[in-house]
Amino acid sequence: MAKIQPKVQGDERDDGLREKMIAVNRVTKVVKGGRILGFAALTVVGDGDGRIGMGKGKAKEVPVAVQKAMDEARRKMVKVPLKNGTLQHEVIGKHGAAKVLMAPAKEGTGVIAGGPMRAIFEVMGVTNIVTKSHGSTNPYNMVRATLDGLRKMSTPAEIAAKRGKSVEEILG
């Protein structure tokens, strides 16, 4: 039986960053003389160790749009604190009508995530996670909601510092 290739493409760069293209949209501008075609690309870039960035690019040709998106993703990378290849704690991210729930998982669970979320966790280096998305399935909104949730992630040390307690008291 033939295996269906996923829409997401990825590769490892010489600088150690992993790149994945999530979506390419063809857009049309109608002018008096006819139609002007263009392309919009959505990509994510990660280092496999908790850093992740999202980029959007627009151009008249697909490769140029993808390259612009990759460059923007590299510039906008943020660090997310991971714990043994999974998240620190359960977190919810929202953007527009998209809502995503992300929860840490035990070793051996794998990446249980759909669509654009899977690409994010693969380039980020997350190996065990359970996710659920609600509302909008638009790739742009899902990626933004996922990144919103990941930005809310905090380590036990950060929480302990905010509360004025020790890490042992926080972890119980």
UniProtKB/Swiss-Prot annotation:
Keywords of this entry: Ribonucleoprotein, Ribosomal protein, RNA-binding, rRNA-binding
UniProt GO cellular component terms: small ribosomal subunit
Residue stretches making up the S5 DRBM domain: 17-80
GO MF annotations, alphabetized: rRNA binding; structural constituent of ribosome
Keyword Ribosomal protein recorded: yes
InterPro entries with a match to the protein in the record: Ribosomal_Su5_D2-typ_SF, Ribosomal_uS5, Ribosomal_uS5_bac-type, Ribosomal_uS5_C, Ribosomal_uS5_N, Ribosomal_uS5_N_CS, Ribsml_uS5_D2-typ_fold_subgr
Coiled coil regions, renumbered to chain: none
Domain of life: Bacteria
Biological process (GO), any one: translation
Pfam families from the UniProt entry: Ribosomal_S5, Ribosomal_S5_C
Family designation: Belongs to the universal ribosomal protein uS5 family.
Subunit structure, as described in the record: Part of the 30S ribosomal subunit. Contacts proteins S4 and S8.
NCBIfam families: rpsE_bact
Domain text: The N-terminal domain interacts with the head of the 30S subunit; the C-terminal domain interacts with the body and contacts protein S4. The interaction surface between S4 and S5 is involved in control of translational fidelity.
Record function comment: With S4 and S12 plays an important role in translational accuracy.
Record-given protein name: Small ribosomal subunit protein uS5
